[in-house]
Design a protein with these regions (language model features):
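A short alpha-helical cap/connector motif
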Residues: 4-5, 9-180, 184-258
């Protein structure tokens, strides 16, 4: 008998084995890539592990923060205290109230007074405590700011020697001092403010760095706080003041402990 040639005629189908073999290889490669991506082997119908409570909370807080900042016309620009606009997150305004009631300062220094909404709010809190006054500085002298016997406005840069000296002269011996920084939020400026004003705050009181949420466009208040705390053991970030979850001042509620 002659040998049978292993050929396929022009009108015959080619065997499927090579095709199936190639498909199987591609499938296995895809599975391997998927396993490497997920970091573990799993069945296609295996449920994903449930998210932790902290992960769920973080996602919800981030979602709220995004909504809050994307809708400033109905949030930041539409927040009032007794008819006057206050550019503050209400949750943070409440924390200020708790701090001032728990440990009332004699002097609250504010950098970045703008139209005086926050100063007016602080003055109302001091009225209820029957003590305290506000020293606040802004680059521009706005004429339509609220007038209150507890508020003294200064015009100039918060980091100028003249303004700092004016504040120091206004503080009487033995007075308790609290400071909140809410002017230029770029890192270099905030860090300079921290270096200048940290010595004015009395032990047990707060140095608040406002708007410390990280800015993707430039180093800001958060980076200033991080650098400041590395070199100053007199302060700690009081995380208990972030109890509501959302704050515009993360790591910014600095308490002087020594």
């Amino acid at each position: 008998m002659g040998q049978v040639e292993d050929t396929v005629g022009p009108n015959q189908r080619k065997p499927l084995v090579p095709v199936i073999g190639m498909g199987l290889l591609l499938f296995l490669a895809g599975v391997a890539i998927g396993q490497a991506w997920n970091g573990r082997w799993f069945r296609a119908d295996e449920p994903r592990p449930p998210k932790s409570e902290s992960e769920i909370s973080a996602e919800r807080i981030e979602g709220f923060m995004t909504w809050y900042y994307e809708n400033q016309q109905t949030t930041f620009s539409n927040t009032y205290w007794r008819g006057m606009r206050v550019i503050k997150v209400p949750l943070d305004a409440w924390i200020f109230q708790e701090i001032i009631h728990e440990n009332p300062p004699d002097v609250l220094i504010e950098t970045g007074s703008y139209k005086g909404g926050s100063a007016n709010y602080f003055a109302s809190l001091f009225d209820m405590e029957k003590r305290g006054r506000i020293l606040t500085v802004e680059l521009e002298n706005f004429t339509d700011r609220p007038r209150h016997p507890r508020i003294t406005y200064f015009t100039g840069s918060s980091v100028s020697p003249e303004i700092l000296q004016s504040f120091k002269k206004s503080i009487r011996p033995g007075e308790k001092v609290m400071v909140t920084l809410d002017s230029d939020h770029h890192k270099d400026h905030v860090l300079k403010e921290l270096q200048l004003y940290s010595s004015l705050v009395t032990v047990g009181d707060y140095l608040v760095v406002e708007d410390s949420i990280k800015n993707p466009n430039y180093p800001g208040a958060m980076e200033a706080v991080e650098e400041f705390l590395k070199n100053n053991s007199n302060y700690v970030a009081d995380k208990s003041r972030e109890k509501f979850g959302f704050t515009a001042n993360p790591n910014g509620w600095l308490k002087r402990i020594r």
